[in-house]
A protein has these predicted regions:
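Residue-level recognition of tetratricopeptide repeat
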Residues: 33, 67, 102, 109, ...
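Flexible helix-coil transition and linker loops at the boundaries of alpha-helical arrays
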Residues: 17-18, 51-54, 88-98, 132-137
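Start-of-helix register in tetratricopeptide repeats
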Residues: 26, 60, 95, 102, ...
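Extracellular, repeat-based ectodomains that mediate carbohydrate processing or recognition
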Residues: 167-604
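Alpha-helical segment of the N-proximal tetratricopeptide repeat
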Residues: 21-50
């Protein structure tokens, strides 16, 4: 408003009838009251200053209009209208009830943005309970909740209203996202994130015109899916067995040999190897029984990671032998002629023999260069810190191999002696203990085969932020790509309930870099950000902290699972999406199932 309320000579203040803080209303006030009850803040904010100043119900109309402006973030206008309402005769108790009610509504919207439906509903109900109007009923609270949830979803994904519809999604930083196809693969286990942990390698893969994925339907059923890309025909086959799904580490990884035989490894957390392969090329109906690979170092397996055939190199499996703070990264290679696996004798990464403490290297997704080179980045995990059991990941390391893991080099070309340890491995980005550095994120290579790594760790204010580091051939650089304000702590054992997912990274043929993630700032929806230049301050990062929504529904605690093979071939992003719970530490599961989606997107 351009005029100060106290100086307004045209307004006609009238006494406000209040009994116990309850307002009697009629006429135009009834319309505004209904708009307030339903949370139609935009309509309340459209009441013109002239209408307010000249209406006999100026005090109450100004108060309700102020509530609308405050909910829309128009703080100055809302404040001026509050002054007008008080000057026009509204008592402070009534004004206070409206303000406190607005606080609860804001809390509800915040909870909804974070994907927490139950607290959101409770806050909206409390907002209505504090209404200064008579006879506001539970039905009004339900109506308010529906309207506010709809507004929240529209704010997050304004161009989409339902999951399976295709269309152009909202853009940022010149980013255009097109959803091209979505396939409902059926209901499946969703009591934790075992189907959607980011470290599945591969969770989806494309080979020879077919796209493959797999997930757990329940504790007795593992489903393998084959999609024929030419006609989008979906075939499935269920592998019966006994699967421990109550530990989200026990995910499924897929590989394929050059003949088209699918390889699958699953259900591990420092336990005996479980592995099968398909009996026929490009087919999923017949499988071997569970078999060993070599039988050597296969009793404490976690994180099976298949590295696909390329440049004359065979199918390879990288895996952890050991536990979280005493482990070795080992490699096995597959001979298609004999159908036998062979062990590399020396681990490539190990902290198992360190003294006076042991450690373990957690690797990010391996990346493959255009020349067939193999690139790894990793953090080191030691014992937890203190009685609080703070997760202690330190430093980001990097190495690359020109010969499928036989020899390794630093980013500057210096040879590495195997096994690489905390002592002799290259640290490309130092991160101190207790910094909430997350393990097992993602890495990709640009057109010069130079590494880009995304992760999160604390900023200088102790708040975990998404970060991107990369090597330009001479030096490593860093940028933030979030501007979070709420701290959290990685603490305890098992799979944690964390407000943000680990990020995925994609680089297109023009060296544009994208990050895919979900979290508290996106209402737990899956989003993508286009990363721009070297911007190492939180202020600069905030300018690009405006991600584009990929999927309009909350996925709760799921992480991005992508088909990196198809992206590299055709710049098509395919994701496996499912809404998942994740009890902290994998304790106290609540049985649930949710649909699994296979969805194609284009980014431009």
């Amino acid at each position: 408003m351009s005029r100060k309320p106290a100086a307004n000579k045209s307004a006609k203040p009238v006494p406000v009838s209040v009994a116990g803080g309850l307002i009697d209303d009629d006429g135009l006030l009834a319309t505004a009251r209904t708009q307030w009850q339903f949370g139609d803040w935009s309509s309340l904010a459209q009441i013109s200053p002239e209408t307010l100043e000249n209406h006999p119900q100026c005090a109450l109309l100004a108060l309700l209009s102020a509530a609308g402006h405050l909910q829309l973030g128009h703080a100055d206008t809302g404040r001026n209208l509050m002054h007008l309402a008080l000057a026009a005769g509204c008592d402070t108790r009534t004004a206070a009830r409206l303000l406190i009610s607005g606080v609860y509504n804001t809390l509800g919207r915040t909870a909804a943005m974070s994907g927490h439906a139950a607290p959101a509903t409770a806050h909206f109900a409390r907002s209505i309970e504090l209404s200064p109007f008579r006879n506001d009923s539970p039905l009004i609270a339900q109506a308010r909740t529906r309207e506010q949830l709809a507004q929240t979803e529209q704010a997050l994904c304004p161009n989409q209203t339902s999951a399976p519809e295709s269309g152009t999604l909202p853009t940022t930083a010149g980013l255009k996202v097109q959803q091209l196809a979505a396939f409902d693969l059926g209901q499946a286990w969703s009591s934790n994130t075992v189907n959607t942990v980011i470290f599945r390698h591969h969770g989806i893969l494309t080979w020879g015109g077919y796209q493959y994925t797999a997930f757990y339907v329940d504790e007795a059923t593992l489903r393998v899916v084959r999609r024929t890309l030419a006609n989008n025909h979906i075939a499935t086959h269920d592998l019966a067995g006994q699967y421990n799904l109550r530990d989200a580490h026990n995910s499924i990884s897929l590989g394929i040999d050059s003949a088209g035989h699918l390889h699958i490894s699953y259900d591990h957390h420092a336990t005996k190897l479980r592995y099968r392969r398909s009996s026929h090329p490009n087919a999923i109906a017949d499988w071997t029984d569970e078999i060993a690979m070599t039988g050597v170092n296969e009793d404490r397996v976690t994180y099976p990671t298949f590295i696909l055939p390329r440049a004359g190199y065979p199918l390879t499996m990288l895996y952890r032998d050991g536990v979280h703070n005493k482990g070795s990264a080992r490699i096995k290679t597959y001979d298609e002629q004999t159908r036998n696996w062979t062990d590399r004798p020396t681990p490539i990464l190990s902290g198992a023999d360190q003294k006076p403490w042991t450690s373990n290297a957690y690797w990010n997704h391996p990346a493959i260069g255009s020349d067939g080179s193999l690139h790894l980045s990793f953090v080191w995990r030691t014992d937890s810190i203190g009685e609080q059991q703070l997760v202690n990941n330190v430093n980001i390391g990097y190495a690359w191999s020109p010969d499928n893991g036989l020899s390794w080099f630093t980013s500057r070309g210096q040879p590495c002696k195997l096994p690489m340890t905390q002592v002799n491995a290259e640290t490309v980005w130092p991160v101190s203990p207790g910094s909430n550095l997350i393990n097992q994120t993602s890495m990709a290579l640009d057109s010069h085969n130079r590494p880009h790594i995304v992760f999160y760790a604390n900023d200088s204010q102790g708040v975990p932020q998404y970060q991107h580091i990369w090597f330009d051939g001479e030096a490593w650089h860093q940028q933030y790509f979030s501007a979070r304000t709420q701290p959290f702590t990685l603490q305890g054992g098992g799979t944690l309930q964390i407000p943000i997912s680990r990020p995925e990274i994609l680089i297109d043929s023009q060296d544009c870099v994208y990050a895919v993630y979900r979290g508290d700032l996106s209402g737990n929806r899956m989003v993508v950000s286009k990363l721009l230049g070297i911007q190492a301050s939180r202020e600069a990062a905030h300018a690009q902290d405006n991600p584009t929504c990929l999927w309009p529904e909350t996925v709760d605690y799921a992480e991005p699972v992508i088909d990196r093979t198809r992206w590299c071939e055709s710049q098509m992003l395919t994701m496996l999406l499912q809404r998942n719970q994740q009890p902290n530490g994998d304790l106290a599961h609540q049985e649930s199932a949710a649909p699994v989606w296979l969805v194609d997107f284009s980014l431009s």
